[in-house]
């Protein structure tokens, strides 16, 4: 082989982000994002370890988890017969945020409102881009040097009844260390 190793699967991640300043101001911006992930065997029949699959929900600070605010960490996606999340081979998510800079000096403070939709699917054949779990919410971001970004979000997951059988409610999410 060209490179050493015995991995017989391919995991592909795609992310597109777009920022647009609004009202000719450096204090108001629109941020949009689209995430897509796919994992499959190169050699058919090769087992893929469960930690390599895609998981979704929460703030995304849990390893290998696509963030979807308004839902618990790793709560969105395929489940086994006893209701445990098993992860999926396909992840898709879109989102939009409207960001407002309250202060830029000495410590930048931003307020935001967001809308997101996403899901994890067992396989490419079972992927349905119209079967998304939706959420909206509000948040705040502080950019503290040299610590980095600290964020607080309240998200409302409209489809929690489908995801975990519970009524929709506002959930708090803490962000740390990720930039805009």
Language model regions located:
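C-terminal outer-membrane beta-barrel translocator/porin domains of Gram-negative envelope proteins
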Residues: 1-108, 113-114, 121-123, 161-165, ...
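Short glycine-rich, acidic/polar surface loops and turns
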Residues: 97-99, 135-141
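C-terminal soluble interaction/assembly domains
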Residues: 128-131
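Surface-exposed coil/turn segments at beta-strand junctions on protein surfaces, enriched
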Residues: 87, 143-145, 167
């Amino acid at each position: 082989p060209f490179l050493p190793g015995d991995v017989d699967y391919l995991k592909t991640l795609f992310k597109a982000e777009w920022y647009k300043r609004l009202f000719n101001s450096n204090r108001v911006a629109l941020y949009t994002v689209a995430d897509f992930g796919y994992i499959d065997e190169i050699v058919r029949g090769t087992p893929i370890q469960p930690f390599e699959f895609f998981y979704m929900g929460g703030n995304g600070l849990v390893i290998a988890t696509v963030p979807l605010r308004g839902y618990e960490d790793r709560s969105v996606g395929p489940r086994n017969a006893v209701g445990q999340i098993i992860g999926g081979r396909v992840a898709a998510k879109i989102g939009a945020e409207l960001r407002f800079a309250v202060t830029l000096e000495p410590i930048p403070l931003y307020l935001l409102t967001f809308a997101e939709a996403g899901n994890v699917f067992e396989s490419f054949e079972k992927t349905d881009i119209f079967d998304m779990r939706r959420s909206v919410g509000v948040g705040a971001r502080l950019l503290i040097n040299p610590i980095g970004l600290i964020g607080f979000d309240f998200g409302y997951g409209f489809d929690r009844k489908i995801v975990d059988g519970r009524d929709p409610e506002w959930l708090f999410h803490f962000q740390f260390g990720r930039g805009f």
